[in-house]
Amino acid sequence: MQPQYYIGIMSGTSMDGADAVLIQMQGKQWQRAVAHSFLPYSDGLRQELLTLQDIGENELHRSNILAQTLSRLYAQTVQQLLAEQNLSAKDIAAIGCHGQTIRHAPEHGYSIQLVNLSLLAELTGIFTVGDFRSRDLACNGQGAPLVPAFHEALFRDANETRAVLNIGGISNISILPPDSPSFGFDTGPGNMLMDAWMQHIWQQPYDKNGEKAAQGKVLPDLLASLLDHPYFSRPYPKSTGRELFSLSWLQGRLKGDEKPEDVMRTLVFYTAQTIFDATKQAAPAIHHLYICGGGIRNPVLIHDLETLFSPDTKLHSTAKLHLDPQWVEAAAFAWLAACWCNQVPSNPHHATGAHSHRILGSGHYGN
């Protein structure tokens, strides 16, 4: 059997742009991640997506127009990746596209990711798989997180308990014991509140290198208020999003006289503390924690995590396991597309709470 190429496209809750990753599979077996491409969202597109997080007027029309806009951007990302690798559409077995989450409401049985999969298939000429969360939700799952099955397939070790931590807008953890089922859940905010505060105060998309946080100090009263959220006492499986952790929620916990840098420093430690608390509660004895996602580029956050987890758990980038930390989530959706094409169940039901394994996604033929 010849190796096959798949492309995964991911737009996370940070809403900064679209990542595309090209992977190589041998039938059902992972071989390697080959290449990555990224296209940023314009400020206008990001703002339009953010407004759809809240109930507003004419949502159906606005969401469908944005789904088409996103699909055209996704197609450009694919075409850019193909050109860089001297490949054509006929070289790709399938695309796996997550879309852009605008609402996640598992308690009501739905999760909405904006993308027009038929348009994406038409524009690229490549068979396209998407709508991965709906089938898990249909069998009483949370529809999230979906990446623990991918983490298990690539990173599980027969001799030690590992964990994989993705720090995107939301943080999620996959626990990979050597001799029992893997599981995972959303620990809470990742970069989401930090980014929202940065945009609100300094009109910048994120705190580059944690520079603003490094100028501040942790505010104990604010930290205690933020930690006093019912999400953290809920048992897993569980998942969350902007619906619970928004800028307005944060502002409701401020007195108004805090230094902006102190708020930022507190938000960084808050993310680290909630990750640590959730991980230790779920799996007290983790030997190695592998980190991916945009949060790995914040040295203040990584320092806080290393301080909290030391000396029992060693922290590493997923690069140590031969996968770039910025590529992991998009690679996961390429892998999910390969699972669909090979009829392999791929929902991590121990993580989502679904009552059984299911093949995730729906397929759309290219032109």
Question: Model-found features: residue ranges?
Answer:
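Glycine-rich phosphate-binding/hydrolytic loop that grips phosphoryl groups
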Residues: 11, 15, 269, 319-366
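Glycine-rich phosphate-binding loops at beta-strand->alpha-helix junctions
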Residues: 102, 286-308
